[in-house]
Amino acid sequence: MKIFADKLSVTLREALLPVYLISGDEPLLVQEACDSVRSTARAAGFAEREVLHCDAGFNWDTLYHEASALSLFANRKIIELRLGGKPTDKGEAIIEWLERKDPDQMLLVVTGKLDKTLLNSAWVKKIDTLGAIVQAPAVSAAQMPRFI
C-alpha cells in the first residue's frame, strides 16, 4: 500500500502493519512519519527498538541475528533499518526477513527518495504487498506556508 506522509496517521488508526518503508526528500517529514509509526507501535506493545545503520560495509547477517535474538525485557520489538545507499543486491535479506512473518517484530525501513528502479525492485514490491510504503516528497513553494 502506497501512502503519503500526510495520510499516515489515518492509516495507523486503522491498522498497524508488519513493515513500513518510509522514504523521501524532506528529512523532517520522514522523521515525523517514523515518529508516528514508532508511537503507534509502542502503544501496541512494541517496547524495544533496535536501529541498524546500513551503509556500504553493513553486514546483512546482522538483520538475521536481530530477528532471531530474544529479548530479556520486551516481547515485541521494532527493527529499524536506516539505509544509507541503495540495497540493490542485498534486498534479498529484507525479503527473507519479511517471509518470516513474526507477529512480535516490526520492520521500519528508512531511506531517501526511491527512484523508479528501486520502486520496481522485488524487495520494495514485497513491502508494498505486506505493509506500507510511505512517501514524504519535498515541500513545494506553494505548500511552504502551510508547512511552516
Where are these regions (language model features)?
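Conserved beta/loop motifs at nucleotide-recognition and modification sites
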Residues: 1-148
